[in-house]
Amino acid sequence: SNSLIEETDPSIKLHDISPSDHALLMYTSGTTGVPKGVIHTHSSLLAGGWTTAVAHNLQSSDRALCVLPLYHINGLCVTVIAPLISGGSSVICPKFSNSNFWTDCEKFKITWFSVVPTIISHLLHGKNDPNKITKKRLRFGRSASAPLAIDTQSSFEKRFGVPIIETMGLTETAAQILSNPLPPGQ
């Protein structure tokens, strides 16, 4: 087998880390001025993923579609770390593609996604729709990073049959601080 682990030089030792050690530096969007660097610890990143997993009742059978950049807390903590914490999986796309979004949801058997309001608007004004199986499989979509207009949310849910959960978070908190509840049965 050509697994990466088997090919790793055994003389290379991993560094000991603790939950309070710095894990990464991520910048805010700069909504209150100049973007600020936020240092996250390993535990803060795990907490950000955990709060998402709990709020959305993520299970090992869930698979997220990540179309957001991983240098954004929504992409990293919500659609990568949260699925891993819950035992699920995540499909990471190089970038958002309006023409491929629903096809990717179908192809990879996606059960949920997290996007920003602009993407919801692009999908709503796009030509493509999910097929019936994909609609049934999608438990919810998640909108964050900016306010989502009620009429846009309602139009999206009516057209695609996918409930949208609006959440609010901060780079500083490693994910959401508020989340609307899941629809009943989700």
For each predicted feature, which ranges?
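Conserved AMP-binding A3 loop
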Residues: A23-A47
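Conserved pre-ATP/AMP-binding loop-to-beta segment of ANL
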Residues: T8-Y27, V34, N57-R63, T173
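Short beta-strand->loop structural element characteristic of the AMP-binding/adenylate-forming
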Residues: K36-I39, C66-V67, S89-K95, I165
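Gly/Ser/Thr-rich phosphate-binding loop
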Residues: I110-V115, L124-Q186
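GHKL-family ATP-binding catalytic core of two-component histidine kinases
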Residues: S18, I39-T41, V116, A149
